[in-house]
Each structure stands twice: as C-alpha cells, then as structure tokens.
Amino acid sequence: TATFGPRYPRGKEYRQRLELLAAKLAPPEGSREAVQSREAVAQAQAELLDLSREAQLANPLLDFDKLLLVRRGNQAPKLGLPQNWQSNSSLPQSGFDDEIMVLSPVRPDGQLSTLFRPRPGQFVGDVDLHFSSQKMLFSMIGDNGRWQIFELNSDGSGLRQLTGEQPDVDSYDACYLPDGRILFTSTAYFVGVPCVYGNSHVATLYRMDAGGGNIRQLCFDQEHDWCPTVLNNGRVLYSRW
C-alpha cells in the first residue's frame, strides 16, 4: 500500500490477515514450544498459501492481459532443475513434458494456450522476452544434440537456432541486451567443476550479436555463472557458484 497507494487498496487488509495467521502459530506467552496440533498448523499453512496467492495477484504490476510462462509436467526428471554445482548441460535430454504457453487473462480462471511445444520429451526453458515483447529467447536441445539458444516471435512464428556451430559446446540461459546483442552462458571454454572430478561442465558468460555471430567470452570463472538479467540501469545481474 505504501508503494502503490490506491492502486493496491487491500494492502492493509492483507497485512492484517498475515499478522493474524502469525498469531495463530505463535507459541503461548512464556512457552518455548508451539502446542498447536498438526491439523491447526496445516490449516494455517493453507490459509497462508491462499493469502500469498491473493495478495500477489492483486499487485498492480500484474495489470496486463497476457503472461508468458513455461508449463512443465510434474514427472520431469529433476523437475528440470540441476544441482547447485551444475547447469543445464547436466540435465537429461529427454523425459520432459514442456511447452511455452500464454495465460490470458492473468488470473486463476484465465485460459492457457500453447505458443510453442518442442519435440516429445524435450526440455524448453530459460525464456526471456524482448523489451518490445515481439520476440523471445529460450533454451532447448538443438539439431546437433547439444543445448542451444533459440529465438521465437511472440505469435509463435519464426523459430530459429542462434547457436550451435561447435559440435561439443552447450549454450543456454540467454537474455537480450539494450544494445541489441545477446548475453548467454556457454561451456565453450571447457572447464569442469573440480570437486566432482570435472564431470559438471562449467558455463560462463558470453555475448553475441543478434544473429548469433561475433561471440565474445566475458567471464573466466572456475565455476558456473547463472541467470543473467538486465537491470533497469543497463547493468547485468547474475548468480555465481
């Protein structure tokens, strides 16, 4: 409410409901241990989940008609999440039930429509929408059996693979830069994580032109770089192991 004022009219109500839930779970005064039953705790957790969903969906920043998302089957290997010493190239190349979808309107009863579905069993993820909203980047297995970066128009047309000249290199997790170029991670410099005997191929940051050319290595880390994201001031935020 302090940030959005009248655009978020129920902010105080959400805070009050949160405080009531916290009070329900608080131990009695003078006691170091909670005495609530498992049923009471489970009920409070369910109420907290409902409150969280309601409060977040009411955020004015979600005041748009469509939401781009990845739908992944719950039987996907590792849910498509590598271990914390790995990156995408350590994931299985099959066993997924993925697709890029659009939710409209953006609410629980909105309709999901498929924008892109890869070949059966393939992973698709790391979606990054262009500033214009007219196209997007994403990662999946390319035509040479390696992880590659693809671009797709927002209407589902114009699929093209941007990386993949080298037969033994994986590239993924890309984002658009304000100058039109693309930042991404790649295993092209052939480094492995030492504490797992090198079997986790390290991906670090690279940059390329919009068409996939003029690739330049930006980081020379021993361990992984993950999730590059452009901030509002043009700087790049990323995670590193």
Q: Which residues does each PLM region occupy?
A:
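Beta-rich catalytic cores
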Residues: 63, 96, 123-125, 132, ...
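Multi-bladed beta-propeller domains
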Residues: 108-122, 153-170, 209-223
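Beta-propeller domains
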Residues: 220-241
